[in-house]
Amino acid sequence: MLEQEENGLFEIPDYEHVEDETFPPFPPPGSPERDPAEAEPDEGSGAPVPVPPKRIVKRNIPKLDATRLTSERGLPALRHVFDKTKFKGKGHEAEDLKTLIRHMEHWAHRLFPKLQFEDFIDRVENLGNKKEVQTCLKRIRLDLPIVHEDFVNNNDEVEETNSLDAAATGFDAFVTSSSDSKRFASEASRNLTEEQQQRIEKNKQLALERRQAKLLSNSQSLENDVTVEESSTGENQEESNGLISADGPHDVPSASTQEEGQLEAEETQLDHPNLD
């Protein structure tokens, strides 16, 4: 510790008369104490230094082959390329052809960007003879699953059908339970007491009597309506007969005049037989 003087200053030690610390010298370059990795090659010796071989990483260059053509971005993707495109139809054939070629170029670029569209078409024509490509085209025409997504969609459809079957079985169980409940209700009705059965029979008889009374009242009202209609029709017939009788004498003179004319003609023929 530094001692504090009277005037408040510290006493500084004398470093001039202190000896420096001695360190050991560095070892020579080829000494065994030194790490061989740190040793530098001796240029004057002329010995050949072995050079480690470089590691060459081989990268798989993508090729447009049958497996790539039948992948998800290959021929199966053509099924949905033209889903959102609308062709104009007759009179616009050139525009429709341009849109078709543009979509095909986009599909070819996504599948294999290195080739131009013309070279891509030539390569696809050559690959059309491969068995894998032909089977893929057949599956597309027959609407069979090709990609993993198609199999997943089929599994979803199977699950939906299974759920429908489960719902149907549940409905059948509900129907059977309802039939069981009806059977239990019939058994419970059998187990009714005699007093309850007598009350039920009395209620049935009262309901039948009320129904018969209603039927009788309805039949009486119908008979009354029929009699009223018959009386009204009889009065109408009497009135019509009276009118006919009143009109009859007017027709009698016409008939009598005709008879008188015929008699006069016969008398003239008898009085003048030689006129003919």
Curated annotation (Swiss-Prot):
Pfam families: Swi3 (PF07962). Residues 64-140 are annotated as: Interaction with TIMELESS. Residues 217-243 have a biased composition (Polar residues). GO terms for molecular function: DNA binding. One of its GO terms (biological process) is replication fork arrest. Keywords: Cell cycle, Cell division, Cytoplasm, DNA damage, Mitosis, Nucleus, Phosphoprotein. The modification Phosphothreonine is found at residue 233. The modification Phosphoserine is found at residue 219. Plays an important role in the control of DNA replication and the maintenance of replication fork stability. Important for cell survival after DNA damage or replication stress. May be specifically required for the ATR-CHEK1 pathway in the replication checkpoint induced by hydroxyurea or ultraviolet light. Forms a complex with TIMELESS and this complex regulates DNA replication processes under both normal and stress conditions, stabilizes replication forks and influences both CHEK1 phosphorylation and the intra-S phase checkpoint in response to genotoxic stress. This is TIMELESS-interacting protein. It comes from Rattus norvegicus.
